[in-house]
């Protein structure tokens, strides 16, 4: 079998950041998949499942209600490796295009108070698996350490050596 593109990224050198993972043509429109990498793979602990699940609920809710970008949002969801999230958006976009949006999103999560949207038995398949305090902590860490100090190394995948 062919190696899928995401397995060809050098995870040893990959930093936290926002990366274009792929672009696909769907029904005549480009869909851009972003790698929202919150943890350096294999070099720092992965996100806790409860924190990542809560980030998923809060970020998806925020993005789908965003006054400018909501009509471009296709999907937000966690990576199986627990090092970040995938964001699928309509349009032929670059990482730089969504830095401000990601700053707003992670600021929203970091500052969130109250009941997590969709975290009830009738709304969620694993409603007990939430950790708002850690979601806020991880989001603030990512915002202040990465999103507020973006460089090309946080926007473009490492090149092959």
UniProtKB/Swiss-Prot annotation:
InterPro entries: LuxS_sf (IPR037005), Metalloenz_LuxS/M16 (IPR011249), S-ribosylhomocysteinase (IPR003815). Its cofactor is Fe cation. It is an enzyme of class 4 (lyase). Fe cation binds at residues 53, 57, 124. Gene3D superfamilies: S-ribosylhomocysteinase (LuxS) (3.30.1360.80). Binds 1 Fe cation per subunit. GO terms for biological process: quorum sensing. GO terms for molecular function: iron ion binding; S-ribosylhomocysteine lyase activity. Keywords: Autoinducer synthesis, Iron, Lyase, Metal-binding, Quorum sensing. It catalyses: S-(5-deoxy-D-ribos-5-yl)-L-homocysteine = (S)-4,5-dihydroxypentane-2,3-dione + L-homocysteine. HAMAP family: LuxS (MF_00091). Homodimer. NCBIfam families: PRK02260.1-4 (NF002604). Belongs to the LuxS family. Involved in the synthesis of autoinducer 2 (AI-2) which is secreted by bacteria and is used to communicate both the cell density and the metabolic potential of the environment. The regulation of gene expression in response to changes in cell density is called quorum sensing. Catalyzes the transformation of S-ribosylhomocysteine (RHC) to homocysteine (HC) and 4,5-dihydroxy-2,3-pentadione (DPD). This is S-ribosylhomocysteine lyase. It comes from Phocaeicola vulgatus (strain ATCC 8482 / DSM 1447 / JCM 5826 / CCUG 4940 / NBRC 14291 / NCTC 11154). The lineage of its organism: Bacteria, Pseudomonadati, Bacteroidota, Bacteroidia, Bacteroidales.
């Amino acid at each position: 079998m062919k190696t899928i593109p995401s397995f060809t990224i050098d995870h040893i050198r990959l930093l936290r950041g926002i990366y274009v993972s792929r672009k696909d043509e769907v029904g005549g429109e480009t869909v851009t998949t972003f790698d929202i990498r919150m943890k350096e793979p294999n070099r720092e602990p992965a996100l806790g499942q409860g924190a990542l699940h809560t980030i998923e609920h809060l970020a998806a809710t925020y993005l789908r209600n965003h006054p400018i970008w909501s009509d471009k949002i296709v999907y937000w969801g966690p990576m199986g490796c627990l090092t970040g999230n995938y964001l699928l958006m309509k349009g032929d976009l670059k990482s730089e295009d969504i830095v401000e949006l990601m700053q707003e999103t992670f600021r929203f999560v970091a500052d969130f108070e109250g009941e997590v949207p969709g975290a009830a038995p009738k709304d969620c398949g694993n409603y007990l698996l939430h950790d708002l305090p850690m979601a806020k902590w991880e989001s603030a860490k990512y915002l202040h350490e990465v999103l507020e100090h973006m460089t090309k190394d946080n926007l473009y995948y490492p090149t092959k050596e």
